[in-house]
Regions:
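Functional-site microenvironments in short loops/helix caps that host divalent-cation chemistry
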Residues: 103-238
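Active-site microenvironments of metalloenzymes and redox enzymes
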Residues: 28-158, 264-270
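Short, polar loop/linker segments at the starts of domains and inter-domain junctions
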Residues: 8, 23-53, 179-185, 236-247
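Short, surface-exposed beta-strand/loop micro-motifs that present aromatic residues
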Residues: 3, 11, 50-55, 189-191, ...
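Extended N-terminal export/anchoring regions of large proteins
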Residues: 1-9, 14-23, 29, 55
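Residue-level detector of short, conserved catalytic/binding motifs and their immediate flanks
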Residues: 13, 60-65, 92, 131, ...
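Short, solvent-exposed loop/turn elements at domain surfaces
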Residues: 21-28, 71-73, 211, 232-236, ...
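Disulfide-stabilized, aromatic/cysteine-rich ligand-recognition loop
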Residues: 1, 5, 186-188, 216-270
């Protein structure tokens, strides 16, 4: 748990990566089996994952926000001394902000932490961790359940949902057309809430199309993951990577069903 301005806090979950050495990484297959129409965005593609920090057993991990960033958290960081009230409305995921706003949030939050709670940040080899948007690979690895699920479950389009998808993800089928307060449904196997549904989540890196078993060389717009409350159940999954332009005709792109969560990592070469 990290403190926030206005006496708030942000909760993180440990995401182990099955690595034990600082430069070790593991191969993970992300995406899924897809038809030709959307294979450019969803087809299974090899990726690599590693962890920034090590526990007492030398198991390496990174940290992922347990919940989507809320309106109250976003405003507490971005508006400085003007502390927002915390109620049902401000406990909804923060929306209608651009990718650039999300990155600015992480920058301002890091500056606040370094000034007010530097001792609370995790460290690796003397270097303090920092908050940023998760990469596409980090997001999908964590949303699928990481090392908490077996290989067969990891490769499914959704993490294990023994009680049915409506108990784990907000979609057009159960959200009644409304954004929902964070954390009301069941979490995924790593204790992360709402990775699927509610709001789609922006990640740090840009969109690349799949080209057979690799990514295309051109990087395009931003990536939105997980589907949202206005999407059907079939669109709320771990495989879909939706490309969203960074800008529209009015400026930086903002959407009513798009938000973000954050991760904590550390410099690679400390």
């Amino acid at each position: 748990v990290l403190p926030m301005p206005c006496e708030g806090s942000m909760v993180f979950r440990v995401i182990k990566t099955n690595t034990k050495k600082p430069l070790e990484d593991i191969k993970v297959t992300l995406g899924g089996n897809s038809n030709d129409e959307d294979g450019y965005a969803q087809y299974a593609t090899p990726n690599y994952i590693s962890g920034s920090f090590a526990n007492e057993k030398q198991e390496r991990y990174f940290l992922m926000g347990k919940y989507e960033v809320t309106e109250a958290q976003f405003n507490a960081v971005m508006k400085g001394e003007q502390c927002p009230s915390v109620n049902m409305k401000t406990s909804l995921p923060a929306i209608n902000m651009s990718w650039f706003d999300a990155v600015e949030f992480t920058h301002k939050y890091n500056e606040w932490l370094l000034k007010n709670a530097a001792d609370k940040l995790p460290t690796e080899d003397g270097s303090k961790g920092f908050v940023r948007l998760p990469t596409n690979a980090e997001w999908e690895f964590a949303s699928r359940g990481g090392v908490a699920v077996d290989e067969a479950a990891f490769r499914e389009n959704t993490f294990p949902m023994p009680d049915g998808i409506a108990r784990y993800a907000w979609s057009s089928k159960n959200a009644n057309g409304r954004l929902q307060v964070i954390g009301l449904l069941e979490p995924n196997p790593l204790g992360l809430f709402d990775t699927l549904g509610n709001v789609s989540e922006m990640v740090f890196d840009g969109f690349r199309a799949n080209k057979l078993s690799r990514y295309h060389g051109q990087e395009g717009g931003m990536i939105a993951r997980g589907g949202s409350y206005i999407k059907g159940e079939s669109e709320v999954n771990n495989t879909s990577r939706i490309e969203v332009p960074y800008y529209d005709n009015n400026g930086a792109m903002k959407k009513k069903d798009m938000g973000f969560r954050v991760a904590i990592t550390a410099p690679l070469l400390t």
